[in-house]
């Protein structure tokens, strides 16, 4: 994918109509460029909104597959020193802090990473960097920090409190996320302005590894590398038994694991279902923690996620059946004919996405890894379409490409972050994963999202030309970062105050939750307006 600025310049032709540069290219159908710019703008905005619906659907599938990956345990057999009997326990394969950074944050940031890396490989040998550009990354960071916090804070039910259980890990992740953008400013404005050297690219990528090590050290409370902070209260059970709400009179029906959003909400609303990404385990004297997981033995694990007498292929087949079914079991219970018609229309709107995403294998294959990888590929594909729509919106409307970069494009590439954090805020008992995904995604976008493409290009340019990589789309970076950090302070201060006064970062009294949400959205609007005025030359 070329830079948004380069793509917009390619899309704009020299012919002018009434003083406006006419966009001659098309994306949806041939002959599209013969339509008026106003009509095309409406079509592109509708297409962008439809892509957001698709991103929401596939991100939910991604989150479900990640649940299966993270909850995987391995059997540990020990001998009782007194009775000499075998004691079988199960130890979690994944550390939940590492899972938040390397699976959740990396996965939701995969659109930026994959598209930028493919662009770097496709344009290898170019002396100027392409990709999303620094402006989009700062805009994406602002979208992650403000609108996603605004959504997550109102997700818990009225009066329900969800707080960060490990403040030490959160502080480590927060510092690394802010440092990522300070580092971006240093290498683009101070160290070697508008130039990326091989050393700078290598150091950028290595810092992702340092983030993982430092966060893990804090989680394990390693001396000299961790903050002396205690953990908060955690649930007694890691994965409580789920209540099967899908049972009806016909026990032989295949369980609908590809259920609609309404059914998903009903099931996730039950407090008998808990996700376990960031509920950290306490250390014992030996430094090893064992968990007895009730659903890990082979017999029950095989049954989990599918009904009696059903197979994996039955479930996979049922995904396609559900994709073309307009009336669900839940909608049949609705008495109002108007609500049933509205639900059927919504299912019709979702049908193309559901049919496409039905190709994602069931999440209980290979502990969820295959579904995890398939989901990432689909997320990247939809994100690519988002970038094309945003390019064309800039082209037909004449909106400054930089404004599009840190608004529509940043929102599109960060949409999976929003959906994943919202689901985590709904289904987990703490706020750890929901907020960790915000801060860690911002880190991943810099250390990996542009670090890897820069490393690919700088290595080639160093050996081929003995030249560095040049950056030409860093306009307004200093000002945008200044506004970002200023508004970020306002966001973090409110989160801390909520912790001290209300007792949690998310939830609480409904009025205060909505006021906090409105405040976070106001900070985002301030960032967007001031950055837009700066790149437009108004201020």
Curated annotation (Swiss-Prot):
Tissue distribution of the protein: High expression in leaves (at protein level).
Database matches in InterPro entries: CaCA, NaCa_Exmemb, NCX_ion-bd_dom_sf
BP-aspect Gene Ontology terms: metal ion transport; transmembrane transport
Membrane topology: Multi-pass membrane protein
Main location (coarse class): membrane
Function: Vacuolar transporter that exchanges protons with Mg(2+), Zn(2+) and Fe(2+) ions. May control the partitioning of Mg(2+) and Zn(2+) between plant organs. Could play a role in Zn(2+) accumulation or tolerance.
Record PANTHER family: NA_CA-EXCHANGE PROTEIN, ISOFORM G, SODIUM/CALCIUM EXCHANGER
Protein family membership: Belongs to the Ca(2+):cation antiporter (CaCA) (TC 2.A.19) family. MHX subfamily.
Protein name, as recorded: Magnesium/proton exchanger
Native species: Arabidopsis halleri subsp. halleri
Taxonomic lineage from the root: Eukaryota, Viridiplantae, Streptophyta, Embryophyta, Tracheophyta
């Amino acid at each position: 994918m070329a830079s948004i600025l380069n793509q917009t310049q390619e899309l704009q032709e020299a012919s002018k109509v009434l003083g406006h540069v006419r966009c001659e290219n098309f994306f949806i159908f041939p002959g599209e460029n013969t339509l008026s710019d106003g009509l095309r703008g409406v079509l592109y905005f509708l297409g962008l909104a439809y892509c957001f619906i698709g991103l929401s659907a596939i991100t939910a599938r991604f989150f479900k597959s990640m649940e299966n990956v993270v909850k995987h345990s391995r059997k540990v057999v020990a001998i009782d020193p007194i009775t000499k009997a075998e004691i079988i326990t199960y130890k979690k394969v994944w550390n939940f802090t590492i899972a938040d950074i390397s699976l959740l944050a990396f996965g939701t940031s995969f659109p930026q990473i994959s598209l930028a890396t493919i662009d770097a490989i496709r344009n290898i040998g170019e002396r100027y960097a392409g990709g999303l550009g620094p402006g989009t990354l700062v805009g994406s960071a602002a979208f992650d920090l403000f609108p996603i916090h605004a959504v997550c804070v109102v997700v818990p039910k009225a009066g329900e409190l969800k707080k960060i259980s490990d403040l030490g890990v959160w502080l480590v992740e927060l510092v690394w996320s802010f440092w990522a953008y300070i580092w971006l400013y240093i290498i683009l404005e101070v160290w070697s302005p508008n130039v990326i050297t091989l050393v700078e690219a290598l150091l950028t990528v290595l810092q992702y590894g340092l983030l993982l090590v430092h966060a893990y050290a804090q989680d394990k409370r390693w001396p000299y590398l961790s903050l002396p902070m205690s953990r908060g209260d955690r649930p007694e059970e890691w994965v409580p038994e789920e209540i099967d709400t899908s049972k009806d009179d016909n026990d032989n029906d295949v369980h609908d694991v590809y259920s609609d959003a309404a059914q998903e909400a009903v099931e996730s609303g039950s407090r008998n279902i808990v996700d376990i990404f960031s509920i950290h385990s306490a250390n014992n004297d030996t430094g090893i923690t064992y968990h007895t997981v009730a659903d890990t033995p082979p017999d029950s694990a095989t049954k989990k996620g599918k009904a009696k007498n059903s197979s994996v292929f039955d479930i996979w087949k049922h995904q396609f059946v559900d994709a073309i079914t307009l009336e669900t079991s839940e909608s049949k219970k609705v008495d109002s004919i108007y609500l049933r018609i509205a639900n059927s229309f919504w299912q019709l709107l979702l049908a193309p996405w559901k049919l496409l995403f039905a190709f994602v294998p069931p999440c209980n294959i290979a502990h969820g890894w295959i579904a995890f990888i398939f989901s990432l590929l689909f997320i990247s594909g939809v994100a690519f379409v988002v970038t094309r729509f945003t390019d064309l919106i800039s082209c037909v409307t004449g909106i400054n490409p930089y404004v599009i970069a840190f608004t529509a494009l940043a929102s599109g590439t960060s949409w999976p972050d929003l959906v994943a954090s919202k689901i985590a805020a709904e289904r987990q008992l703490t706020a750890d994963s929901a907020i960790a995904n915000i801060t860690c995604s911002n880190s991943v976008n810099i250390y990996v999202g542009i670090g890897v493409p820069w490393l690919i290009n700088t290595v080639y340019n160093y050996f081929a030309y003995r030249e560095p990589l040049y950056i030409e789309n860093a306009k307004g970076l200093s000002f945008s970062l200044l506004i970002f950090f200023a508004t970020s302070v306002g966001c973090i201060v409110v989160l801390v105050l909520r912790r001290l006064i209300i007792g949690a970062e998310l939830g609480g009294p409904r009025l205060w939750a909505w006021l906090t949400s409105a405040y976070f959205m106001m900070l985002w609007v301030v960032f967007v307006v001031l950055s837009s005025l700066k790149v437009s030359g108004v201020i």
